[in-house]
Amino acid sequence: VAVEIDARLADRLPRTISEFDPAAIDRLAVVNADALQVHQLPTPPTMLVANLPYNVSVPVVLHLLAEFDSIHRVLVMVQREVADRLCAEPGSRTYGVPSVKARWFGDVAYAGDVSRTVFWPVPNVDSGLVSVTRTAPPAGVTRDEVFSLIGAAFAQRRKQLKSALSGWLPGHGSVQ
């Protein structure tokens, strides 16, 4: 299944596939839609492989992982800065909301560099490959609860965590 927002590219994709891999054309389904609005696909996807527009890469990855439990593996090309944020470890300067939310879904790893020189025209940014291998979610808590906590914890990065979370639990004026 291929999801493509641009109608011209969605129309052209089957011809491109038939030119390069004629045997694969029978297995291709093209959905002309915004990936952020996709809630259903012709078949449940098991992998997400994408070259994502850099400005929406994190929301697209998180949305598709949330929407399709059937996705077990992810390999996406994103802007190098975004890759660094997704793969950041606790304590690093780039660790933040994308890092924590991505880890809710699985093990996140930096899979490699993609030089700007492989593109034409040459962009002003480098790219990186990020892989995610889905793991079972933590028991006893929902994704919405955890993502709400993540949002509160990182909303004011300069505050101490105790202060940032003080209003998170209704009826609890302070966090101990």
Which residues does each predicted region cover?
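C-terminal lobe and adjacent flexible extensions of AdoMet/dcAdoMet transferase-like proteins
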Residues: 134, 151-176
